[in-house]
Curated annotation (Swiss-Prot):
Protein name: Archaemetzincin
Domain of life according to the entry: Archaea
Cofactor note: Binds 2 Zn(2+) ions per subunit. One is catalytic, whereas the other seems to have a structural role.
GO biological process, any: proteolysis
Keyword Zinc set for record: yes
Organism: Methanocaldococcus jannaschii (strain ATCC 43067 / DSM 2661 / JAL-1 / JCM 10045 / NBRC 100440)
Obligatory cofactor(s): Zn(2+)
PANTHER family (alphabetical): ARCHAEMETZINCIN, ARCHAEMETZINCIN-2
Active site: E129
Entry's Gene Ontology molecular function annotations: metallopeptidase activity; zinc ion binding
Top-level enzyme category: hydrolase
Family affiliation: Belongs to the peptidase M54 family.
UniProt keyword Heme, yes or no: no
Residues noted as binding Zn(2+) 1 in the record, renumbered to the chain: H128, H132, H138
Gene behind the chain: amzA
Length: 179
């Protein structure tokens, strides 16, 4: 049984259209329905000049609140309080999540651009953050998509799917997804 839920992808600033379309396709397969909303501007007040990064919590709070889950996708480098950077942030049991593509890009680490690598990394972090919205916390299974990623190596090591334990937690809440 698959629960049909709608995920709205919210571009925050200019975001690579190919990545947005890839996420839309995969979310449709996993969650049931997905749409891409019109782009919104990056809130300038979220920029921290001394760090040269944007505060993820401020961007997250700027996302629209709708009945559906909203996943913000941005190209800017983000951080959260007490952390040098984050790949994303979400409201636990909320409606909003955010990912940044900045540190998911191979070129951030001095490597050649690779769209396929970027797509799978974006998918992993997006499904991870949506997991938080659905009530999942970090998983100890390093292969589970809900594993905490402290570096890009951690992102690359984990799968894009929830482990059996995390799937069971979702099912216990009446959430059935196709993954």
């Amino acid at each position: 049984m698959v629960m049909i839920m709608r995920i709205c992808i919210q571009p925050v600033g200019d975001v690579n259209d190919e990545i947005l379309k890839f996420l839309k396709k995969k979310f449709g397969e996993v969650f049931g329905m997905c749409e891409i909303l019109p782009k919104i501007d990056i809130p300038i007040y979220a920029y921290n000049f001394s760090r040269g990064q944007f505060n993820s919590t401020l961007i997250l709070k700027s996302l629209p609140t709708v009945e559906d889950i909203v996943l913000g996708v941005t190209e800017v480098d983000i951080y959260a309080d007490n952390l040098n950077f984050v790949f994303g942030e979400a409201e636990l049991f909320g409606k909003r999540a955010l990912i940044s593509l900045a540190r998911l890009r191979p070129e951030f680490y001095g490597l050649p651009p690779n769209k396929d690598v970027l797509k799978i990394r974006a998918l992993k972090e997006a499904i991870h953050e949506i997991g938080h919205v659905l009530g999942l916390i970090h998983c100890e299974n390093k292969r589970c998509v809900m594993s905490f990623s402290n570096s890009i190596i951690d992102v690359d090591l984990k799968d894009w799917r929830y482990c059996k334990k995390c799937l069971k937690k979702l099912q216990d809440r009446g959430i059935y997804i196709s993954i």
